[in-house]
Amino acid sequence: SKVYIHGLIRDEKGQKMSKSKGNTIDPVQIIDKYGCDALRFTMTSLCTYGGQDIKVSDERFEYGRNFANKIWNASRFVMMNLEGVDNKAIDKSKLTLVDKWILNQLNETAKIVNDNMKEYRIGEIAHTLYDFFRSEYCDWYVEIAKIQLQDPELKANTQRVLRYVLDMSLRMLHPIMPHITEEIWQDIKAISGFGADEDVPSALIIANFPKYDEEWAFPKEAEEMNLVFETIKSLRNVRQSFNIPTSATVDVEIRTEGKEKEIFGEIEAYIHRLAKVNNITYANLD
């Protein structure tokens, strides 16, 4: 057997908690205010490798609560858009560039999570899942999926990818946030099933835990999409530096050539939507 030892939990000033000092935190009150999963996720994310002491304040649990809200809201959006979806697995022949990107990122996340589990890097697991779900799945893929869902040719497979990535994300989050993930997972199961090859278990807690799978590795496409995301971020930064209202569209010129120009041509609709761009023209690099 193995024993996991974490650092001493101190108050926000770094002092040892004690009833005589009146600086203790009652977990029951935290659960009442922020929720059980928020408490679990926050404390997990604060675990440092090496057993350093942990400073905790009441406000820090807002981090876990906000993430739980993000999971809930994103899941509601996905479920609202699963209407009419079949119970088939993802059609690999119909994957778009951004579909391959999110599947690759999910695959890499599963690898990192499993590797960290072996080393008992509990805090790293929480941060990895937070960054993937909030930034890559919600902020990028879900926003682009809204565009693909409007295309009759892409809708069905986009629904399958949305569902699959959410399913795998819930499985990885479940050990940390068991209550919200189980409820969402059961709702998805009732609405559409999972389009999975495996027999779907009765509960998330006994579902297979995601592992790295070479089948979902798309490193080239991931690199190409990262170029697109950096371009969108740059356009947003330029807009902000010139105080251009978020409601206003702008015309842009992108200087690129060769393979990169082909990539931008494939995902031009995403740039229009996410960077509030009207017309895009291309010029060769000087």
Annotated model-derived regions:
Residues S1-D32, K55, E59-D286:
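Feature 926 captures the class I aminoacyl-tRNA synthetase adenylation module centered on the KMSKS loop
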Residues G35:
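Short helix- or helix-capping micro-motifs
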Residues F41-T42:
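Non-catalytic, structured segments within soluble enzyme domains
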Residues S45:
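Structured mid-domain segments that build the active-site/substrate or prosthetic-cofactor binding neighborhood
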Residues Y49-Q52:
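Transmembrane helix-loop junctions at the membrane interface of multipass transporters and ion channels
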